[in-house]
């Protein structure tokens, strides 16, 4: 991997200037500036290099930052190879915080209809609620029927308030007319976020007709 990327990841992990004292400004730290730098990357040549780095790197903190760099590049240039790699890597990681970060990043990426979403689908059924919610969000930005069907399945089998809220949010983004009957059931909800979320999702779906 190019020295620039190695240096960037090292700077993202650098906490040497993070002194939690009065007047401390986190936006001036080495890691904060490096993270903002990573968010702007658009070089396609970095994709393969970062993929190779992740596959070999044993240090999970470095892998975590490399994932961040990769999904920012994938978002900025709509790189499907990077997106598919990130989804595939869900099955390789075990740290829930890394997985949540990956899933939250994947949520922002365009996923073509033929993209294999199996690992995301499995994560929506995880026993850890943080993982479930991030995975439900990761089903956004796709036209896949499988994604919509999984979210509808979740709604048909849950009473958990937050499962419902996250599912409705994803349907706002990807739902079709077949989601409307299920969403309409939540219009009578006494929970404001559920009721308003369902209203907004139905309206957004109808705009897409």
Where are these regions (language model features)?
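Short inter-helical turns and helix N-cap capping residues of alpha-solenoid HEAT/ARM repeat scaffolds
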Residues: 27, 58-59, 94-95, 127-128, ...
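Amphipathic alpha-helical scaffolding segments comprising HEAT/armadillo-like alpha-solenoid repeats
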Residues: 1-19, 41-55, 76-91, 111-125, ...
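Structural detector for internal amphipathic alpha-helices that build alpha-solenoid repeat scaffolds
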Residues: 21-42, 64-77, 97-112, 130-144, ...
